[in-house]
């Protein structure tokens, strides 16, 4: 008898709609691969009852808080249910851009200069030291909540007088916010599947940066896979991504986003331990380039679950 698989989708985070699309695609792909899979939306179903409902494994197609941040992973561990993707600690660290950057920096890996602020600091009013640190980043900067995905709450700031509004928006989504030096690009993403690093993808958004609309709604965003890098550059990028991935303790599958600045240096942006699996999504695109169908990809991800 085959295992009964729960595909967790939807949820309650800011990325619910993306997750519903990801989950529907994953469900179809698993069923095409002969897997006995069923959709489960934690917003509507008590996921603490998954075991009593007869499920033996879980495919996590949730994005953002409550699905990608270690909390769900911890619950599944306590229940003794194998699940896809990274464990508790790696999921929590990857969801937290600030702590990811601190770990990467500590490991000697390249990250863009940044300033971190708490909501309390912002509401109190920034002191001269903080203002000087922000000023040292130059303009433009990118302002982002530390623990949101899909570019939710993110803004590019090109003029000093726009910074307050950008911070206000970011603080609507998190207690901690990053102000990062703007890197001119292009942006790359590299997917990891088990021990295999898939071909890199170069991302060319129509707008100024790769925001929520460019990721999920726009047909004008262009993706290049293979990315067009020279062999040595591709090898260097893959080596950097592998170090970034293992530094956070990630496993199973996921994605690391990287920027190539005008100085020819790669800089790590963030790790995604439960990436999108929609029609616009990048892991399926990289897998396709590596000769793997969508169904083969999701079945392989499930096989890696522990």
UniProtKB/Swiss-Prot annotation:
Pathway: Cell wall biogenesis; peptidoglycan biosynthesis. Its EC number is 6.3.2.4. It comes from the Bacteria. Mg(2+) 2 binds at residues 270, 272. It is found in: Cytoplasm. Pfam families: Dala_Dala_lig_C (PF07478), Dala_Dala_lig_N (PF01820). Keywords: ATP-binding, Cell shape, Cell wall biogenesis/degradation, Cytoplasm, Ligase, Magnesium, Manganese, Metal-binding, Nucleotide-binding, Peptidoglycan synthesis. Binds 2 magnesium or manganese ions per subunit. GO terms for molecular function: ATP binding; D-alanine-D-alanine ligase activity; metal ion binding. Mg(2+) 1 binds at residues 257, 270. GO terms for biological process: cell wall organization; peptidoglycan biosynthetic process; regulation of cell shape. Its cofactor is Mg(2+); Mn(2+). Residues 101-303 form the ATP-grasp domain. The active site is at 15, 150, 281. ATP binds at residues 134-189. It catalyses: 2 D-alanine + ATP = D-alanyl-D-alanine + ADP + phosphate + H(+). Gene3D superfamilies: 3.40.50.20, ATP-grasp fold, A domain, ATP-grasp fold, B domain. Its main location: cytoplasm. Belongs to the D-alanine--D-alanine ligase family. Monomer. HAMAP family: Dala_Dala_lig. This is D-alanine--D-alanine ligase B. It comes from Escherichia coli O6:H1 (strain CFT073 / ATCC 700928 / UPEC). The gene is ddlB.
